[in-house]
Structure formats: C-alpha cells, structure tokens
Amino acid sequence: MSAKALGGGMPIGAFISSSKIMKSIEDKPILGHITTFGGHPVCCAAGNASLNYIEKYQLLDKVSEKEALFRKLLVHPKIKKTSGKGLMLSIELDNFDEVERTMKRCMEHGVIIDWFLYNTNCLRISPPLIISNSEIHKVCKTILKSLD
C-alpha cells in the first residue's frame, strides 16, 4: 500500500503487489482489493503530477540521506528507540504523557508531529519528501528542546 506522497495532498493511494499475491485475492473475497471511491480523475491527475515531480527532482534518491540525518540528530536520553524506514520514523519515549507533552511543545514552535494510534508511546515523524536538510535540523532541534 502506498499513499503518502502519491497524491500530493489529494486522497489517493495505490495497492501494489506481485501477480501471485494479486491472483490470491481475486476471489477470497472477490476483488477484495478495490474501493468504492477509487480512481477519481482529479485525484489521479494530482497523483500523476506528484509522481512526475518526484521523478523530475529525484526526491527518492535523497530519502536515505535524510533518514540518516534524522537518526544522527535525534539522540537524547529520553529517546528509547528510533524505528522506521525512510521518512516515516517512530521515536519511542517512556509513555504517552511524555509523547503528548513533546507534541504540544513542538506545536508551539511550529513543528507538527503526531503519535501512533497502535503505539501511543511513540512520536510519529513523517515529513514530506521535499523537506530540506536545514528543515530537518530545525525539526530535530525543536524535538530535542521539547524533550528537555
């Protein structure tokens, strides 16, 4: 499943799989992978424009470097673990109270982060692919300051 960068803010996602797996869900349930809202032309046009932009500016080529920068900068005694892949990262703290306090402090300084519904001890960092290295530095500095 993919959706974050695909629509450039418009509601669209993609269900991508091998032929073997797609064949296995053909009838159990029948076409269980389709939606009732899929394929709207405006959203598809936005998706196409987003993909063109991502390719033109080679945004995927820079994701590993940006992930490494986040991981390098996000070091603090209150951070138990950093998980994730690319620009979809999780910062584990001791408890939800710490997560909520950190989120509120970050918001006061213009940085929007969230938590995971399935793991409330973790901050969710998922910036757009266009985030610059200087913005990553600002975000990390704000998070670290908010943890103090």
Model-derived features: positions:
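Conserved N-terminal phosphate-binding loop of PLP-dependent enzymes in the Aspartate aminotransferase
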Residues: 1-148
